[in-house]
Amino acid sequence: MSYFIFKGISSQEMGLIIEKNCDITKPNRKYLEFEVEGRDGLLTKDLGTYECTTKEFLVHLIKEDMPSLDYLLDWLDGEGELISSTLHNRHYIAKVDNEIPLEQIIENGLYKFPIRFKCQPFSYRNKNDVIQITEQGTTISNSCTRPSKPCLTVFGNGTINLSITSDRGVYQITLKDVVDSITINTDTMQCYKGLENCNSKMTGKFPILQKGKNTFEWSGGTVTKIEVTPNFGYLI
């Protein structure tokens, strides 16, 4: 039976029967297009990024099986992880993007309506285990279809020079005056320690885990370990 899970709660728990599951679609790549006088067609610039995607489920609501209307609406409010039974081993970051027909739900014991989610472009592995690095030259392999934006926590002290090498090149990062630990979050493009903003302590680009092998090395201050949350992702 088809289902979806949003914010850790299954559609089955909410009294929803899925008549039509969401389609599997690839996000559109973003381009800028220019018309140039005297030139055929368009001049296209690839921005290297992707648009959001839409995942729509056509559902039947069985009022008797619904915990409560307030609980249903609270569940569908805000952003969270979305898992479809079609691809049950990965999730999207999503939020509901259409109005829920409250009047019809209240008046009818059984009602059919769509639930449409706007999703960030990529899907991510449900299993996103932290990888611990304690030795120079340790390699993390990205076997997914997209370069990933990891979150790294470096444990150590002093000024640390961190390098991450792949077939695409080297990320060179300097972390100044580290005391105990510092976190580099590529997804949010922030460097911090707890609630403390540490962007001024970091020089270099936020690292990407490229497809294939990524090798970690460091010099300078002392490093006891690096914890890597890889955030491996896919195009669908």
Regions found by a protein language model. Name each.
Residues 1-52, 89-103:
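Solvent-exposed edge beta-strands and adjacent loop segments
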Residues 5-9, 118-120, 208:
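Mixed-charge, glycine-accented linear interaction segment located at domain edges/termini
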Residues 31, 54, 79-81, 149, ...:
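Exposed beta-strand and adjacent loop surfaces of beta-rich binding modules
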Residues 34-64, 109-122, 214:
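Oligomerization/assembly interface segments of phage tail-like spikes and tubes
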Residues 49-53, 76, 107-111, 144-146, ...:
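Solvent-exposed loop and beta-edge segments used for protein-protein assembly and interaction
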Residues 58-99, 215:
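Short, acidic/charged, Gly/Pro-enriched secondary-structure junctions
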Residues 99-132:
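Short, charged interaction patches at domain edges and termini
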Residues 125-236:
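Intrinsically disordered, low-complexity segments enriched in serine, threonine, and glycine
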